[in-house]
UniProtKB/Swiss-Prot annotation:
Keywords: Amphibian defense peptide, G-protein coupled receptor impairing toxin, Secreted, Signal, Sulfation, Toxin, Vasoactive, Vasodilator. It is found in: Secreted. The keyword Ligase does not apply. Residues 24-61 are annotated as: Disordered. Expressed by the skin glands. This is Probradykinin-1. It comes from Pithecopus azureus. It holds the Pfam family FSAP_sig_propep. GO terms for molecular function: toxin activity. GO terms for biological process: defense response; vasodilation.
Amino acid sequence: MSFLKKSLFLVLFLGLVSFSICEEEKRETEEEENKDETEEQSEEKKRFEPVPPGFTPFRLT
């Protein structure tokens, strides 16, 4: 009986450790994806700078 308890605790402990490692890796990949998305958004903002009010690209004379 004691052998079964120790084996069960060992299996549960190893499962918990592997699960936490997987969650950590998942969190890191999500952070990297979010970082890439924010970099892309900032690049888009740089391309499209705000236009002052009343500005027209056409020359009116």
